[in-house]
Amino acid sequence: MILGIGNDLVDVRRIERTIERFGDRFLDRVFTEAERRRAERRSAAGPHSPRAATYAKRFAAKEACAKALGTGLNKGVYWRDMGVVNLPGGRPTLALTGGALERLRQITPPGMVAEIHLTLTDELPIAQAIVLISAVPAPQP
């Protein structure tokens, strides 16, 4: 059962300019420590740097997730409540905390478990994320 779908496009140049202008103030407000560690391993050299693209994809993922949750970035859902993480095989997903996790619990029907599916891509200067939140029957003991 699909609980929510969200999609977002971000101009990598916009994220690059925002980082140049606000630096750590922006990065600390929007991204989790794990996201920052991953992005900071990427090269910051040149226009449309891999570092900026990494941040842009994660920014788009947060926007898409907030849309899939049906709240946008309000109603107690904040940027750092949603963090892009990678599963052991490398596939990206979102780890939710705080208000985002609470909203996920609210929209998940009893007896079901929510699953978050995330796809990220970029074709410079655009980064895109699509989030699909589904509910599947909870495992039986």
Swiss-Prot record:
Its EC number is 2.7.8.7. GO terms for cellular component: cytoplasm. Its main location: cytoplasm. Mg(2+) binds at residues 8, 63. It comes from the Bacteria. InterPro entries: 4-PPantetheinyl_Trfase_dom (IPR008278), 4-PPantetheinyl_Trfase_dom_sf (IPR037143), ACPS (IPR002582), Ppantetheine-prot_Trfase_dom (IPR004568). It catalyses: apo-[ACP] + CoA = holo-[ACP] + adenosine 3',5'-bisphosphate + H(+). Its cofactor is Mg(2+). Keywords: Cytoplasm, Fatty acid biosynthesis, Fatty acid metabolism, Lipid biosynthesis, Lipid metabolism, Magnesium, Metal-binding, Transferase. It is found in: Cytoplasm. GO terms for molecular function: holo-[acyl-carrier-protein] synthase activity; magnesium ion binding. SUPFAM superfamilies: 4'-phosphopantetheinyl transferase. One of its GO terms (biological process) is fatty acid biosynthetic process. Belongs to the P-Pant transferase superfamily. AcpS family. Transfers the 4'-phosphopantetheine moiety from coenzyme A to a Ser of acyl-carrier-protein. This is Holo-[acyl-carrier-protein] synthase. It comes from Rhodospirillum centenum (strain ATCC 51521 / SW). The gene is acpS.
